[in-house]
């Protein structure tokens, strides 16, 4: 295994972990980072999806007590409602993803569409934060299926790379009446089924690009994603308990504009597809 490949895998794993659960788009950052590292062929695209497994497992680990309680309480009203809400929120993006993911990847999985989505998403976050929030739900356990459906519909926007799955679901939660902490935590829980499904589906569909020699690359990337995601989750929950999402909105806008300006002036030769 080439050491350069392992270094790239490690760096991309850190990018995945740090950005997956923040409202700044992990897919967008991975596309841009892969382009800069010249790691953007078919195998690289499978890799960037597969290392999401490390990030997913970090959520499972961080909230292991909650997930174990749901499993032990299976059949109780509280556990059933929690699982129902996840299923309701999962379905809209899952259905649209199966129908349109090939078209989306062909046209939008490139640096410039990502940059536009970063800026647009940042503006939407600023708009959502400036709206008056009427909090109906302080805790994830107090959600109903209507809240979940609204968040699930918002998650469909995240099929566009650069939008951010966590950003779409968190803003959807805020607009549905959830507190910032409840919206962030439900976004984390919702990541488990949607990311497991997307990861295994994508890896299976592109299994011809995978070889046993690539195992080290995937292991390094996944471990880096797990550790960095765990750090990001804990820091993010502490942050949103006392702050809004304006900082992330301005980061998105600034980063997206940098990509667009460097492309316009030819400072970086971003790929066009």
Curated annotation (Swiss-Prot):
Biological role stated in the UniProt entry: Catalyzes the dephosphorylation of undecaprenyl diphosphate (UPP). Confers resistance to bacitracin.
Organism taxonomic ancestry: Bacteria, Pseudomonadati, Pseudomonadota, Betaproteobacteria, Nitrosomonadales
Transmembrane segments: 4-24, 43-63, 82-102, 108-128, 183-203, 217-237, 253-273
rRNA processing in keyword set: no
InterPro entries: UppP
Entry keyword annotation includes Calcium: no
Membrane topology: Multi-pass membrane protein
Keywords, comma-separated and alphabetical: Antibiotic resistance, Cell inner membrane, Cell membrane, Cell shape, Cell wall biogenesis/degradation, Hydrolase, Membrane, Peptidoglycan synthesis, Transmembrane, Transmembrane helix
Listed name of the protein: Undecaprenyl-diphosphatase
Catalytic activity: di-trans,octa-cis-undecaprenyl diphosphate + H2O = di-trans,octa-cis-undecaprenyl phosphate + phosphate + H(+)
């Amino acid at each position: 295994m080439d050491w350069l490949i392992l270094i790239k895998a490690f760096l991309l794993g850190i990018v995945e972990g740090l950005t997956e659960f923040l409202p700044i788009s992990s897919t967008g950052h991975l596309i841009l980072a892969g382009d800069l590292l010249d790691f953007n062929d078919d195998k690289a695209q499978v890799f960037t999806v597969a290392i999401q497994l490390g990030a997913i497992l970090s959520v499972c680990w961080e909230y292991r007590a909650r997930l174990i309680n749901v499993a032990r309480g299976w059949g109780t009203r509280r556990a059933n409602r929690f699982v129902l809400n996840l299923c309701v929120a999962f379905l809209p993006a899952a259905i649209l993803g199966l129908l349109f993911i090939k078209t989306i990847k062909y046209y939008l999985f490139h640096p410039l569409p990502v940059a536009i989505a970063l800026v647009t998403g940042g503006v939407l976050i600023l708009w959502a934060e400036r709206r008056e929030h009427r909090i109906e739900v302080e805790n994830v356990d107090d959600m109903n299926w209507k809240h979940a459906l609204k968040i699930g519909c918002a998650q469909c926007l995240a099929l566009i790379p650069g939008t951010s799955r966590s950003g779409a679901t968190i803003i959807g939660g805020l607009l549905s009446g959830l507190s910032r902490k409840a919206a962030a935590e439900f976004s984390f829980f919702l990541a488990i089924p949607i990311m497991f499904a997307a990861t295994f589906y994508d890896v299976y569909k592109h299994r011809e690009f995978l070889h046993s020699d690539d195992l080290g690359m995937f292991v390094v990337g996944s471990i880096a994603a797990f550790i960095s995601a765990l750090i990001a989750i804990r820091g993010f929950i502490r942050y949103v308990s006392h702050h809004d999402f304006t900082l992330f909105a301005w980061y998105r806008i600034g980063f997206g504009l940098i990509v667009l300006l460097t492309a316009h002036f030819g400072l970086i030769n971003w790929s066009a597809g």
